[in-house]
Amino acid sequence: MLFAGDGDYYFSLDDDILYPRDYVERMTDFLQRGNNAFIAGVHGARLKTDIKHYLTDRDVANRRMAIATESSVHILGTCTTAFNTDTLRLDVRRWKHRNMVDLTFALICTERGIPLKIISREENWVGSQEENQSDSIFSELQKDDTVQTTMAKALQQFHTNNPEREQQ
């Protein structure tokens, strides 16, 4: 990302995910219809009002689910995000936490006032090579989500204190 040009589109991808042939075209079109003013994603979540545990206190729109209407979310799964570099520039080398990319990304975007939105799509538009891998970040999260819960509470607090951001 450090070497991306002005106005380029950046796609964050994961080698465990199967992307459809029209992925880049549809994500780019989604962004352009919104004047590149937001971050686009496939997998996203909205935090519940009272967060006790990150894993259980969010409503997830899983990347495999059919979604009829594009909508705003608090968190995007960064394995399925796209954005225009005029909207966002990042240097991940400065990030404090390892393996907490989704929450760190959401906090940065929220602090900068950049909306996060999921694209409408049919069921299984984006698939997986393998589900429930024992060595995945998600498996580790299931053992202990303490740090993620603290980060999610900070994100939720920001949204609570800035309700106008919820309308974007």
Where are these regions (language model features)?
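Conserved catalytic core of nucleotide-sugar-dependent glycosyltransferases
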Residues: 2, 11, 18-93
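A conserved donor-nucleotide-binding helix/loop in the catalytic core
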Residues: 1-10, 104
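C-terminal catalytic/acceptor-binding lobe
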Residues: 90-168
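Conserved catalytic-core segments centered on acid/base and nucleophilic motifs
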Residues: 10-14, 18-19, 105, 109
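Cofactor-binding active-site loop characterized by glycine-rich and histidine/acidic residues
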Residues: 4-6, 13, 142, 149
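Short, high-confidence coil segments that cap the C-terminus of an alpha-helix
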Residues: 7, 35-37, 114
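Conserved beta-strand termini and adjacent loop/short-helix elements that scaffold enzyme active sites
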Residues: 4, 42, 119-121
